[in-house]
């Protein structure tokens, strides 16, 4: 009661925050006459002046906000013909403060972003504007780039297909547009490079995420993964698929809520008989068991034209939230191969994770993060808990006039779609445009087929027809237009009403099914009623819809039975609408827990990732790596000699002998020790190791530092890749610890830490084991063919190329032997040295590019 009165008198927290910002709006407006007097060439000069004040004089961005916002508003009026409204100024301030601005469709979010973008670009550290697809990134960069260019700021855009040099150039711009995937993958690829000059990103200063709910919430369950092909055979998938596709309903059970499928006892017996196995769950048959369960999931849980489509001999995932194709993305853990076997297309090799990060942890790298969307309030708690982002709702510039009608609920899907087709036909006759939202490609194509039979012209927009997406969406407001869109693809493109449509009631939104998330439904509704335009919306549901069937209340079904509704009749009741929203809240809570659990587990990996990437960055950019080598050496020596504490000289258990053997193996001490040598004391061992390294330094000359860097990075990458695989395996089975009354998350954290510590130690030992065995052989007697290490997947483009090391003046070439004698060398695979890139620094030490120096004649 008290809280209600407090809000009534003083307003909500949101209202009070907006009131504080309005005083700054007055300051900005007061500067408008002054800005209008400036000549065009004065704008860029002003920006340079502000840059100097921030970068050299230490002036805060907050102090410059009124002047910069006023300058940008006037520049926008001159260049784009658009002047920022007061509410757009407030939206810009909210973004600058590192919060999420919730602004309804048509309120000009793209223009709002220019205000904080210019202000934060003054620091010279770069600003990233994150969009949901390449089309919007290119469109906004070209459109708003006119304004930034007028102000003397450079604009870049990161899209698929750019090489590293082009990407680096775009990131050097003051403002860089791109998709969340491109930014995330560039970060991962940067942490797989070998040299500091190969890095494309220059830090994570400030990001504005457009459609922030789509990127930070909807896609948070899908980690970014760079993977390479593993050595697993794919033949088993076909064999298992032939068995699983013959299973009968009594052989398995399906949990649609959890999206899982399990074999019954009859199913297990059938699979054992068909695969000729004694016990499917025997540890020796763990691979076969995994294949069977993934194939069962592919057949019974995943649906064609809903979860994926088949295109060009490939299984392509469909984004469940946007309806767009996710080209290049693959399900992990063998599920994608099971789907390929199910559909009879070519089965690609299984992948092994080389690098991964979730969007949650990627975007938390930024010093300041903000976002814009039309629908964030329903997820405000999650934004606050996971990203520490506050959601501020910005009132529309003009009052909303859209009418949102109550849902209509039918008993069956057939009755529902009959009513939908009838409603579309009636609206088309009246020339009122209608946008029909579906949640699957299957539904959109079924509706399209029925409308075609009735002779109703229409456009279909789904993952199969996405090339003209923006054009189709932009035309959806013309008189008589019928547009069918899957999961509201086309966000970011305004639907402008055609001539006379306002008098017809504006754009009508017709939802064929409620989505699991209220926010997605609100996004669909938000396509109508922009900038105070009239509009309307209504959802059509049935008791057979997935949401109603899995999460809906039995009360609705009971009510419909009591009312004795006849075929084709619908129930329209506020209680029903509330019950549907209650079902959606339960689903949202479930998905929130899934995302939070994913983050809890990824936080363990994130801490480890930060340590590895920091070490990797140091190895890439530091000129002198000897201090790191000294640290590695002392860590190994401390560990070896700590095992001998209290062990007598006349050790009968062989501990001293084992320690000596380990030292000789790791540091290749046989290279400098006399025959019949015994374990040296701790202080005597260090000079021996330095002697081994000094011999290598004298043999390799100026190439020593490159060789040193190469082996350190190579061992770090190899061990990290293996560690990722081990952590995946640990994660897969950790849930079983719950049966032993142990917390799986704590167990994962503890064991993951132990595995990480062991990996770090393995890196230290392997670096010395490899480096101490390098030999320089005469070039004419031991030619080494230069090769390029090709990435296995498209996502892995930009992986480092290993180096070809030549002795100074080309007197010799590197070889790597695996031990101290010829027998060891014969049994160890040789490491071929890849070629030098033409734009890389010349290894002769001149400081010039290879193509301008020793490679000029090649």
UniProtKB/Swiss-Prot annotation:
ATP binds at residues 88, 106-110, 494. InterPro entries: Helicase_ATP-bd, Helicase_C-like, P-loop_NTPase, SEC_C_motif, SecA, SecA_CS, SecA_DEAD, SecA_motor_DEAD. It is an enzyme of class 7 (translocase). Zn(2+) binds at residues 842, 844, 853-854. GO terms for cellular component: cell envelope Sec protein transport complex; cytosol; plasma membrane. It comes from the Bacteria. GO terms for biological process: intracellular protein transmembrane transport; protein import; protein targeting; protein transport by the Sec complex. Pfam families: P-loop_SecA (PF21090), SEC-C (PF02810), SecA_DEAD (PF07517), SecA_PP_bind (PF01043), SecA_SW (PF07516). Its EC number is 7.4.2.8. It is found in: Cell inner membrane; Cytoplasm. Keywords: ATP-binding, Cell inner membrane, Cell membrane, Cytoplasm, Membrane, Metal-binding, Nucleotide-binding, Protein transport, Translocase, Translocation, Transport, Zinc. PROSITE patterns: SECA, SECA_MOTOR_DEAD. Its main location: membrane. It catalyses: ATP + H2O + cellular proteinSide 1 = ADP + phosphate + cellular proteinSide 2. Residues 808-848 are annotated as: Disordered. Its cofactor is Zn(2+). Belongs to the SecA family. Part of the Sec protein translocase complex. Interacts with the SecYEG preprotein conducting channel. Has a central role in coupling the hydrolysis of ATP to the transfer of proteins into and across the cell membrane, serving as an ATP-driven molecular motor driving the stepwise translocation of polypeptide chains across the membrane. Monomer and homodimer. Part of the essential Sec protein translocation apparatus which comprises SecA, SecYEG and auxiliary proteins SecDF-YajC and YidC. This is Protein translocase subunit SecA. It comes from Desulfovibrio desulfuricans (strain ATCC 27774 / DSM 6949 / MB). The gene is secA.
């Amino acid at each position: 009661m008290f809280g209600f009165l407090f809000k009534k008198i003083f307003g909500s927290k949101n209202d009070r925050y907006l009131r504080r910002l309005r005083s700054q709006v007055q300051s900005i407006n007061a500067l408008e006459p002054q800005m209008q007097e400036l000549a065009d060439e004065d704008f860029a000069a002003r920006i340079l002046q502000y840059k100097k004040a921030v970068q050299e004089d230490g002036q805060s961005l907050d102090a410059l906000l009124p002047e910069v916002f006023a300058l940008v508003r006037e520049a926008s009026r001159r260049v784009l013909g658009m002047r920022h409204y007061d509410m757009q100024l407030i939206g810009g301030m909210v973004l600058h403060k590192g919060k999420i601005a919730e602004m309804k469709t048509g309120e000009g979010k793209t223009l709002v972003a220019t205000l904080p973008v210019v202000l934060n670009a003054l620091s010279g550290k770069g600003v990233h504007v994150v969009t949901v697809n390449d089309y919007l990134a290119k469109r906004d960069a070209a459109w708003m780039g006119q304004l930034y260019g007028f102000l003397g700021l450079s604009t870049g855009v990161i899209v698929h297909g750019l090489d590293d040099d082009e990407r680096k150039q775009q990131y050097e711009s003051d403002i860089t547009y791109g998709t969340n995937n491109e930014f995330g993958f560039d970060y991962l690829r940067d942490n797989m490079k070998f040299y500091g000059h190969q890095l494309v990103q220059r830090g994570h200063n400030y990001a504005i995420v457009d459609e922030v709910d789509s990127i930070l919430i909807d896609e948070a369950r899908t980690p970014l993964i760079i993977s390479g092909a593993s050595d697993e055979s794919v033949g088993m998938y076909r064999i298992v698929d032939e068995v699983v596709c013959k299973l009968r309903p009594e052989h398995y059970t399906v949990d649609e809520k959890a999206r899982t499928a399990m074999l019954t006892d009859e199913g297990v017996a059938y699979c054992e008989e068909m695969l000729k196995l004694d016990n499917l769950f025997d540890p020796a048959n763990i691979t076969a068991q995994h294949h069977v369960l993934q194939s069962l999931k592919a057949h019974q849980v995943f649906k064609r034209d809903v979860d994926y489509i088949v295109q060009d001999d490939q299984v392509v995932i469909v984004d469940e939230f946007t309806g767009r194709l996710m080209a290049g993305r693959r399900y992990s853990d063998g599920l994608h191969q099971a789907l390929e076997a199910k559909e009879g297309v070519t089965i690609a090799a299984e992948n092994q994770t080389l690098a991964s990060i979730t969007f949650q942890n990627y975007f938390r790298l930024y010093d300041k993060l903000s976002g814009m969307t039309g629908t964030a309030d329903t997820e405000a708690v999650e934004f606050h808990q996971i990203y520490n982002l506050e959601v501020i709702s910005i009132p529309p510039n003009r009052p909303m006039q859209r009418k949102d009608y109550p849902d209509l609920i039918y008993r069956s899907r057939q009755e529902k779609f009959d009513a939908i087709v009838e409603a579309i036909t009636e609206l088309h006759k009246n020339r009122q445009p209608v946008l029909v939202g579906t949640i699957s490609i299957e539904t959109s194509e079924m509706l399209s087929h029925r409308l075609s039979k009735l002779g109703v012209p229409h456009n279909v927009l789904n993952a199969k027809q996405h090339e003209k997406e923006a054009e189709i969406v932009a035309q959806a407001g013309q008189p008589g237009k019928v547009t069918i869109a899957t999961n509201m693809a086309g966000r970011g493109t305004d639907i402008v009403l055609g001539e006379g449509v306002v008098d017809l009631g504006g754009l009508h939104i017709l939802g064929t099914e409620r989505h699991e998330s209220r926010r997605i439904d609100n996004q669909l509704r938000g396509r109508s009623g922009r900038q105070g335009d009239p509009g309307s919306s209504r959802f059509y549901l049935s008791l057979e819809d997935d949401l109603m069937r899995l999460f809906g209340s039995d009360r609705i079904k009971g009510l419909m039975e009591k009312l004795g509704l006849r075929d084709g009749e619908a129930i329209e009741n506020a209680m029903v609408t509330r019950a549907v929203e209650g079902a959606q809240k339960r689903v949202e809570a479930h998905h929130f827990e899934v995302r939070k659990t994913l983050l809890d587990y990824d936080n363990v990996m994130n801490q480890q990732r930060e340590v590895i990437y920091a070490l990797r960055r140091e190895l890439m950019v530091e000129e002198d790596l000897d201090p790191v080598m000294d640290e590695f050496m002392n860590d190994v020596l401390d560990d070896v000699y700590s095992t001998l504490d209290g062990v007598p000289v006349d050790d009968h258990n062989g501990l001293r002998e084992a320690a000596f053997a380990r030292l000789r193996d790791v540091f290749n001490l046989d290279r400098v020790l006399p025959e019949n040598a015994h374990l040296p004391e701790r202080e005597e061992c260090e000079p021996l190791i330095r002697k081994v390294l000094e011999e290598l330094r004298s043999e390799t000359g100026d190439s020593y530092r490159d060789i040193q860097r190469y082996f350190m990075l190579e061992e770090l990458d190899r061990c990290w890749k293996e560690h990722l695989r081990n952590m995946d395996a640990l994660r897969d089975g950790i849930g079983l610890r719950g049966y032993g009354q142990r917390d799986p998350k704590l167990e994962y954290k503890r064991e993951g830490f132990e595995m990480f510590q062991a990996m770090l130690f393995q890196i230290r030992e392997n670096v010395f084991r490899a480096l101490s065995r390098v030999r320089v052989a005469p070039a004419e007697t031991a030619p080494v063919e230069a090769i390029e290490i090709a990435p296995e997947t498209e996502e892995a483009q930009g992986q480092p190329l290993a180096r070809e090391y030549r002795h100074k003046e080309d007197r010799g070439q590197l070889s790597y032997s695996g031990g101290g004698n010829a027998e060891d060398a014969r049994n160890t695979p040789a490491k071929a040295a890849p070629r030098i890139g033409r734009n890389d620094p010349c290894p002769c030490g001149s400081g010039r590019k290879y193509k301008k120096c020793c490679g000029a004649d090649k």
